[in-house]
């Protein structure tokens, strides 16, 4: 399978805002190259400092499926960059487009991706030899072409929430599972049953492989959000984007047990109020709102 790589030459100041735009537009993965990335906690940790050459600019690379309308997508990115430039210095803002093979991108991840600790969870690349210390829970991961490496702020927020809200014996539904990272973490924290769904066939395959890597039994299937799901769960988790979360808020109560938890993330800060209004409209009680960088997590519950 081939993918479009969209590369934007920008400033370190603007890289997070541009990453948010690209994720919103459906990027399956984003890689940031800048002069600070080596020292940032919870982000890429370089295997070899020789991989990194100091530059006076940053580059944000995003990967989109071959089926994308690349002309329309590029035009939309240009318009969003113009809007962003009104309040932040985006530098040159030059956009480059190329095609890459799935294998090439998968190998590129390995240059930057190393173990990441999030609470009691350690996300470990499948190719790394890593031994857990103390009571740490290891989640092995090969992200492939699916979103969810454990390094993105929205994923970190979700993993922290899973550690807080998922208890042994609970039933968990992961909507938009991506790499399967959240579903696997829930199972590692002794959830009784975990169902993981994604509309993307590539994500389903990647999640299945990651479940095998971790030796956990998870039901994984292609599905559009909660459509056709008749069971009810103690925890529903969705790390997607604001618009889809608002759509999901209309139906999530159908798959939640009474007084149980909906963990939602992937919400950029300027869309938080829209999401909260949607939850209020659909009678979801807000339990917790948490922010990390420009990303937000909302925990709500189904009231009786």
Swiss-Prot record:
Keyword S-adenosyl-L-methionine: yes
InterPro entries linked: Ribosomal_L11_MeTrfase_PrmA, Ribosomal_PrmA_MeTrfase, SAM-dependent_MTases_sf
Top EC class for this record: transferase
Keyword annotations from UniProtKB, A to Z: Cytoplasm, Methyltransferase, S-adenosyl-L-methionine, Transferase
Catalytic activity: L-lysyl-[protein] + 3 S-adenosyl-L-methionine = N(6),N(6),N(6)-trimethyl-L-lysyl-[protein] + 3 S-adenosyl-L-homocysteine + 3 H(+)
Gene Ontology BP annotations: methylation
Localization terms from the record: Cytoplasm
Gene3D superfamilies on file: Vaccinia Virus protein VP39
MF terms in GO: protein-lysine N-methyltransferase activity
Residues annotated to bind S-adenosyl-L-methionine: 155, 176, 198, 239
Main localization (coarse): cytoplasm
Its EC number(s): 2.1.1.-
Superkingdom: Bacteria
Pfam families to which the protein is assigned, alphabetical: PrmA (PF06325)
Gene Ontology annotations for the cellular component aspect, listed alphabetically: cytoplasm
Summary of the function given for this chain in its UniProt record: Methylates ribosomal protein L11.
UniProt record similarity statement: Belongs to the methyltransferase superfamily. PrmA family.
Protein name: Ribosomal protein L11 methyltransferase
């Amino acid at each position: 399978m081939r993918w479009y790589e969209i590369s934007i030459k920008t400033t370190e100041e603007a890289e997070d805002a541009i990453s948010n735009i690209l994720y919103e537009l459906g990027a399956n993965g984003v890689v940031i190259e800048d002069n600070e990335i080596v020292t940032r906690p919870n982000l890429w940790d370089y295997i070899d400092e020789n991989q990194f050459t100091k530059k006076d600019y940053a580059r944000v690379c995003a990967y989109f499926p071959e089926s994308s309308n690349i002309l329309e997508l590029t035009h939309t990115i240009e318009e969003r960059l113009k809007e962003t430039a009104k309040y932040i210095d985006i530098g040159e803002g030059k956009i480059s487009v190329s095609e890459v093979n799935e294998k090439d991108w998968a190998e590129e991840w390995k240059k930057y991706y190393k173990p990441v600790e999030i609470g009691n969870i350690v996300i470990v690349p499948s190719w790394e030899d890593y031994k857990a210390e103390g009571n740490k829970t290891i989640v092995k991961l090969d992200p492939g072409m699916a979103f969810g490496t454990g390094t993105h702020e929205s994923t970190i927020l979700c993993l922290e929430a899973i550690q807080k809200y998922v208890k042994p014996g609970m039933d968990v539904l992961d909507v938009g599972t991506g790499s399967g990272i959240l579903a696997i973490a829930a199972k590692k924290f002794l959830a009784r049953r975990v169902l993981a769904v994604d509309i993307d066939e590539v994500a389903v395959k990647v999640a299945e492989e990651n479940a095998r890597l971790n030796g956990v039994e998870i039901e994984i299937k292609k599905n559009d959000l909660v459509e056709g799901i008749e069971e009810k769960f103690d925890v529903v988790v969705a790390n997607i984007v604001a618009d889809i979360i608002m759509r999901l808020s209309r139906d999530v109560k159908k798959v939640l047990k009474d007084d149980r938890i909906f963990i939602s993330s992937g919400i950029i800060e300027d869309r938080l109020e829209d999401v909260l209004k949607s939850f209020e409209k659909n009678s979801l009680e807000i339990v917790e709102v948490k922010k990390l960088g420009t990303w937000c997590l909302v925990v709500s519950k189904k009231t009786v």
